[in-house]
From Swiss-Prot:
Tissue specificity annotation: Expressed by the venom duct.
Family: Belongs to the conotoxin A superfamily.
Comment field on protein domains: The cysteine framework is I (CC-C-C). Alpha4/7 pattern.
UniProt-recorded name of the protein: Alpha-conotoxin-like Mr1.2
Annotated source species: Conus marmoreus (Marble cone)
Protein backbone atom coordinates (compact mmCIF):
# COMPACT_ATOMS: atom_id res chain seq x y z
CA UNK A 1 0.00 0.00 0.00
CA UNK A 2 1.32 3.41 -0.90
CA UNK A 3 1.55 6.35 1.47
CA UNK A 4 -1.30 8.15 -0.28
CA UNK A 5 -3.58 5.13 0.08
CA UNK A 6 -2.69 4.71 3.78
CA UNK A 7 -3.41 8.39 4.40
CA UNK A 8 -6.79 8.07 2.67
CA UNK A 9 -7.71 5.06 4.81
CA UNK A 10 -6.64 6.95 7.93
CA UNK A 11 -8.88 9.90 7.01
CA UNK A 12 -11.83 7.59 6.37
CA UNK A 13 -11.40 5.96 9.79
CA UNK A 14 -11.24 9.36 11.51
CA UNK A 15 -14.34 10.56 9.65
CA UNK A 16 -16.30 7.40 10.49
CA UNK A 17 -15.33 7.65 14.17
CA UNK A 18 -16.40 11.30 14.29
CA UNK A 19 -19.78 10.58 12.71
CA UNK A 20 -20.51 7.69 15.09
CA UNK A 21 -19.48 9.76 18.10
CA UNK A 22 -21.61 12.74 17.05
CA UNK A 23 -24.77 10.70 16.47
CA UNK A 24 -24.42 8.80 19.75
CA UNK A 25 -24.07 12.08 21.69
CA UNK A 26 -27.32 13.36 20.26
CA UNK A 27 -29.15 10.21 21.32
CA UNK A 28 -28.03 10.48 24.93
CA UNK A 29 -29.49 13.96 25.56
CA UNK A 30 -32.68 12.56 27.07
CA UNK A 31 -30.79 10.27 29.41
CA UNK A 32 -28.54 13.12 30.52
CA UNK A 33 -31.57 15.30 31.29
CA UNK A 34 -33.06 12.57 33.48
CA UNK A 35 -29.78 12.19 35.36
CA UNK A 36 -29.63 15.94 35.97
CA UNK A 37 -33.18 15.87 37.40
CA UNK A 38 -32.21 13.12 39.83
CA UNK A 39 -29.12 15.05 40.86
CA UNK A 40 -31.11 18.22 41.51
CA UNK A 41 -33.59 16.24 43.64
CA UNK A 42 -30.72 14.84 45.68
CA UNK A 43 -29.28 18.32 46.17
CA UNK A 44 -32.68 19.64 47.26
CA UNK A 45 -33.02 16.89 49.87
CA UNK A 46 -29.52 17.57 51.15
CA UNK A 47 -30.22 21.28 51.46
CA UNK A 48 -33.49 20.63 53.29
CA UNK A 49 -31.62 18.44 55.75
CA UNK A 50 -29.04 21.16 56.21
CA UNK A 51 -31.73 23.78 56.82
CA UNK A 52 -33.10 21.80 59.76
CA UNK A 53 -29.63 21.59 61.35
CA UNK A 54 -28.90 24.89 63.19
CA UNK A 55 -25.11 25.01 62.63
CA UNK A 56 -25.48 24.12 58.97
CA UNK A 57 -28.35 26.60 58.61
CA UNK A 58 -26.16 29.36 60.05
CA UNK A 59 -23.50 28.70 57.39
CA UNK A 60 -25.97 28.38 54.49
CA UNK A 61 -28.77 30.89 55.08
CA UNK A 62 -28.80 31.92 51.42
CA UNK A 63 -29.72 28.36 50.41
CA UNK A 64 -32.34 27.95 53.10
CA UNK A 65 -34.16 31.19 52.19
CA UNK A 66 -34.78 31.99 55.84
CA UNK A 67 -36.61 28.68 56.46
CA UNK A 68 -35.69 26.15 59.13
Amino acid sequence: MGMRMMFTVFLLVVLATTVVSFTSDRGSDGRNAAAKDKASDLVALTVKGCCSNPPCYANNQAYCNGRR
